């Protein structure tokens, strides 16, 4: 523990392949006395160089996430509540790294999440399957009459992918999710992974198609989210294409589009 003039916290937290300058980050986002934690792929040591830092400030504010760019690095800033009850959100806090928590309030919340891990995971899986059913039902009812029917089908497939990922105790992470799905052990449930990826259409991934998808996904994000998330989308799609991860890029762009389509 290192003391600074504004607060008591670690100057740096080092993970497998990067170090996070906590002191400068907390000053940059001006968190005051609220607990702060980091989740996402960076927290689980499987992030790519293009991945952002997912930072949650537990200030209880009901506002959309924002994007911060600092020294060429992107931070996705979320606002959370210490009294959160939604399994979809609590799941994102599982195994979170505490960056600032003088009153141990966040530590207590994370301890409760750990105790109820199985219940939270099961609730999330159930919610995903319900959402998948709704999407498929909408596609079926509007097939041939609605130009969005195919979008509903793909959205349903992504919800099923979320459920399969969670059944395998892997928190959904769109940039890395296809890789994880491929690596899961064989089982009756995991046999549906092939059906999911075929429904999404990852075999169609080509550099030219991905360039068009990237542009449309960024534009859709700007229209729906209005928080500069499109900059992260552009950086990730560029990285994945340049590293020949075409199917992963297709899956990622489709996942982001699904989220905004549902919104």
Pin down the residues of each PLM region.
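Metal-dependent nucleotidyltransferase catalytic core
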Residues: 2-100
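Generic alpha-helix detector with strongest preference for long hydrophobic helices that associate
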Residues: 3-7, 37, 84-87, 106, ...
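Residue-level signal for well-ordered alpha-helical segments
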Residues: 3-6, 13-15, 32-34, 105, ...
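Intrinsic-disorder-associated interaction segments
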Residues: 3-4, 8-15, 99-106, 118, ...
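Glutamate identity and glutamate-enriched acidic tracts
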Residues: 8, 27, 52, 65, ...
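Internal, well-ordered alpha/beta segment that forms a basic, Gly-enriched binding/recognition surface
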Residues: 75-139, 144
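Conserved nucleotidyltransferase catalytic core and NTase-mimicking acidic/glycine-rich helix/loop elements
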Residues: 123-263
